Amino acid sequence: MVTIVLGAQFGDEGKGKITDLLSQCATLCCRAAGGHNAGHTIVHDDITYDFHILPSGLISPDCINLVGTGTVVHVPSFFKELDALKAKGLKEADKRIFISDRAQVCFDLHSVVDGLEEAILAGKKVGTTGKGIGPCYSDKASRRGVRIGEVLEEGVVESKLRALEAGYRRQFGELKYDLEDEVKRFNEYRTKLQPYVVDQMAFMHKHRSSPSVLVEGANALLLDIDHGTYPYVTSSCTGLGGAIQGLTLNPTSIKSIVGVVKAYSTRVGSGPFPTEQNNAVGEKLQKAGREFGVTTGRRRRCGWLDMVMCRYSNAINHYTVINLTKLDILDDFDEIKVAVAYKLDGKLLESFPAQADVLDKVEVEYVTFPGWKSNTMGATKWEHLPTNAQRYVEFIEREMGGVPIRWIGTGPARNHMIERI
């Protein structure tokens, strides 16, 4: 049966830890969409691991891992990340990771184009990671991209890459990009990549009887190309639909959909953020939560938890259970606010707005909770939480339509987790 872990907000919710926890029992762990723009950190046995394109199931020695068809793979980053994991003790990791032959190749060329496209936008930048994800997905949609399986065929990458470069040169003029170097490297990757490439359909059929399949979502619902705060989104489908499509899952095999919700809100890059706190509260959240992007190192924007957004996310992803993360970051606040409604021009909005400019204008209605002003870091039992912290959790649960909050994160370590049965 399949468990899918999905971000419910703007990403950086802390999906890595619950994925790590669930992967201990998983026989197969998969990434369905996105690329090396994603990033999360896992602390396991006092060792810190950073993941971007690779599934974090690699930490578990009995778990096979797949980078699925819906992803875009920057091959140098794939090998760099794999080497870093092996250097930290995961010696057999390269024997447990596979890539769909239908996944797209993200070239250095795409990263160069990403920067040029952002520069053209000037004051209206999307705030991408600069990793080339958008241009790569654009080439996929335009049917001129390169698939991973084609890397194994002599001459295919060179022919297609030269055509891509020529097209972008016509569009942007001279590029600060070494075409010959990238062609040379991919000629070398042809042999190096071969042991990792699989036919996903045959691979998934082979593992169809796996007792536990874990799908690791990247980014989050509000960054989804269709359902997110467009155009301030990533270029892939980051929700439930993307997981099913990117891995050709049988929907009837899905046992659990885990929505990961941070106890407050953060966002990296540009785009609307109704509950953002450009004040001492935001600075305190940023400092206490150590809110810097794993991929870019950029400081994350911080604000209060937004239940309007989370309810919208739940309506699309149909969570069966919630993992609430980083509750301990709120330990030292006198009061804690939660957004429960939006108004526009004095009128209550009945749904989450599709237009980014509308989200920029909404008036947020909050419910205010008294803080608990005591240390919850490392708590592992529900009864160890202060009463005010319990009330905060229970309120979120009600706002999510009764979807149970099964796990509560109380710190960075693997065992800093409360599980409510």
UniProtKB/Swiss-Prot annotation:
Protein name (record):
Adenylosuccinate synthetase
Q: What is its main location?
A: cytoplasm
The note on the cofactor says: Binds 1 Mg(2+) ion per subunit.
GO MF entries: adenylosuccinate synthase activity; GTP binding; magnesium ion binding
**Top-level taxon of the source organism:** Eukaryota
Residues binding IMP, per UniProt: D12, E13, G14, K15, N37, A38, G39, H40, T129, R143, N219, T234, R298
Q: Which UniProt keywords apply?
A: Cytoplasm, GTP-binding, Ligase, Magnesium, Metal-binding, Nucleotide-binding, Purine biosynthesis
Main function: Plays an important role in the de novo pathway and in the salvage pathway of purine nucleotide biosynthesis. Catalyzes the first committed step in the biosynthesis of AMP from IMP.
This protein's cofactor list reads:
Mg(2+)
Catalytic residues at D12 (proton acceptor), H40 (proton donor)
**Which pathway does the database say it acts in?**
Purine metabolism; AMP biosynthesis via de novo pathway; AMP from IMP: step 1/2
Q: What does the record give as the reaction this protein catalyses? A: IMP + L-aspartate + GTP = N(6)-(1,2-dicarboxyethyl)-AMP + GDP + phosphate + 2 H(+)
User: Which InterPro entries does this UniProt record tie to the protein?
Assistant: Adenylosuccin_syn_GTP-bd, Adenylosuccin_syn_Lys_AS, Adenylosuccinate_synth_dom1, Adenylosuccinate_synth_dom2, Adenylosuccinate_synth_dom3, Adenylosuccinate_synthetase, P-loop_NTPase
A Pfam entry, by short name = Adenylsucc_synt
Record flagged with keyword GTP-binding: yes
Question: Could you say which residues bind Mg(2+) here?
Answer: D12, G39
